[in-house]
Amino acid sequence: MLYHGVDLVEVRRIRQAVMRYGQRFLARVYTAAERADCEIAPQVMRYEALAARWAAKEACAKALGIGLRGLGAFTVDYPRAGLHDIEVVRDAAGRPTLHLSGVAAQTANALQIRALAVSLSHTDELAIASVVAWVDLSGV
């Protein structure tokens, strides 16, 4: 069985948040590893890289069927992961991967998710992320 989440983010929204709140926004939303990874991106693509990671966090939360704390009011009472509970990191080959902790990891374990795949893309205006979660039902 597969669970899928996708999210689209306007790069300008992330740029505006960084310009307005600076390091406070960056530290609240992104882990130290994510911030460091985006810092090595060429200056012209830094906001796109940040927006793609934001989209990945949202897409992963959607695939897991949970919300993200700090992203507005929810009318349904369900688990909400912290923004640092879903981390976008690179593997040895440079591909984006997801590292889960906290509520996100607990939910993935409860759903018996065996693997997560993330794909990121962006233009200068939009960033998109797609997350597929694979559940092995062969033992059921």
Curated annotation (Swiss-Prot):
It is found in: Cytoplasm. GO terms for molecular function: holo-[acyl-carrier-protein] synthase activity; magnesium ion binding. The keyword Repeat does not apply. Mg(2+) binds at D7, E58. It comes from the Bacteria. Signal peptide: none annotated. GO terms for biological process: fatty acid biosynthetic process. It catalyses: apo-[ACP] + CoA = holo-[ACP] + adenosine 3',5'-bisphosphate + H(+). Its main location: cytoplasm. Its cofactor is Mg(2+). Keywords: Cytoplasm, Fatty acid biosynthesis, Fatty acid metabolism, Lipid biosynthesis, Lipid metabolism, Magnesium, Metal-binding, Transferase. Its EC number is 2.7.8.7. One of its GO terms (cellular component) is cytoplasm. Belongs to the P-Pant transferase superfamily. AcpS family. HAMAP family: AcpS (MF_00101). Transfers the 4'-phosphopantetheine moiety from coenzyme A to a Ser of acyl-carrier-protein. This is Holo-[acyl-carrier-protein] synthase. The lineage of its organism: Bacteria, Bacillati, Chloroflexota, Chloroflexia, Chloroflexales.
